[in-house]
Amino acid sequence: MGQAGKALREVLTSYGISQNKLATAMGLPRSAVYKWVHEERDPTALTVVGIVKALRGMNSEAAEAFIRLYLGEPTENED
């Protein structure tokens, strides 16, 4: 457990976004975001998409940072 939670915690801290603000933007209770950030529960793939959309609405750099931290850096396909 935890890759999404770790990435989300780092992004929220780095960009000054509160758990409550993200939860409100997603239409979810703050407790859901708390559980992801504290690695008590992993968000589903569909929820990760919702996290990215909500972050983009607040700060596009935060959304890109979350994607990068969660998925890692893209690698070039070497032939």
Language-model features and meaning:
Residues 1-16, 21, 25, 52-53, ...:
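A short, Lys/Arg-rich alpha-helix, primarily the initiator
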Residues 13, 38-41, 56:
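Alpha-solenoid HEAT/Armadillo repeat architecture
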Residues 16, 35, 61-79:
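Short, charged recognition helix plus adjacent turn
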Residues 22-27, 39, 54, 69:
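Residue-level detection of beta-strand scaffold positions
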Residues 27-43:
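Recognition helix of helix-turn-helix/homeodomain-like DNA-binding domains
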Residues 45-65:
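DNA major-groove recognition helix of helix-turn-helix/homeodomain DNA-binding modules
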